[in-house]
């Protein structure tokens, strides 16, 4: 066990926890503004990480990735996870398909916004010659982009599946049936080289674009 990698992985986990909190809060806030106060009544329009935590997606899987990475599997650098799904009652929405899509996209959009904001913050740290802080913030930006593209996978109950469901007009009954096995499918698919390559390529490309936007020629993802 490499304890330096454990420490590095735990920093990544704390970054993930913060990013997931903003991600889920964005879903809840958007649902509230679209007319469904279900998540609001459950206290999900909040930046308190505890209310958004999912035992498997926020605790078990990410920490397992940290430990496996420290044991030499090479997994620890690209830590991913998910929060507790935000409840949305479509009957409260004025335009269910459109607004459900907006609610779904809000999470990944928040991650993209955070990735850009964090890179601007990294530029401040670089100017102040605070290289360690710059490294942490850049890594947090990378994790935010990973979360963005991971959640856009069209597999229930990830955000991309809501976009696909509303685009093709899938029935709620069919979606619910598929969702019962969704996270099993997700865990299997992210082990496939093609799927991980698509996520990593999208993340790298977007990260390089943000680097150019910010004007911060840092070392990209290795």
List the model feature ranges, each with a label:
Residues 1-222:
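Hydrophobic transmembrane alpha-helices and their immediate loop junctions
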């Amino acid at each position: 066990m490499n304890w330096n990698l454990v420490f590095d992985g735990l920093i990544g986990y704390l970054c993930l926890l913060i990013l997931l909190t903003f991600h889920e809060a964005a879903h809840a806030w958007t649902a509230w503004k679209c007319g469904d106060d279900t998540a609001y009544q459950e206290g999900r329009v909040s930046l308190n990480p505890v209310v958004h935590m999912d035992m498997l997606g926020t605790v078990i899987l990410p920490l397992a990735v940290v430990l496996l990475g420290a044991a030499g599997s090479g997994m620890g650098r690209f830590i991913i996870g998910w929060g507790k799904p935000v409840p949305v009652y479509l009957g409260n929405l004025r335009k269910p398909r459109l607004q459900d899509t907006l609610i779904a996209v809000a999470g990944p959009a928040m991650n993209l916004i955070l990735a850009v904001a964090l890179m601007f913050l990294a530029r401040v740290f670089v100017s102040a010659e605070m290289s360690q802080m710059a490294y942490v913030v850049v890594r947090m930006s990378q994790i935010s982009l990973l979360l963005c593209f991971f959640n856009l996978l069209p597999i229930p109950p990830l955000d991309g599946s809501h976009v696909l469901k509303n685009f093709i007009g899938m029935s709620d009954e069919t979606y619910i049936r598929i969702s019962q096995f969704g996270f099993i499918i997700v865990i299997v698919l992210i082990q496939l080289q093609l799927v991980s390559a698509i996520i990593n390529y999208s993340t790298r490309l977007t990260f390089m674009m943000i680097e150019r936007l910010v004007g911060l020629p840092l070392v990209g993802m290795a």
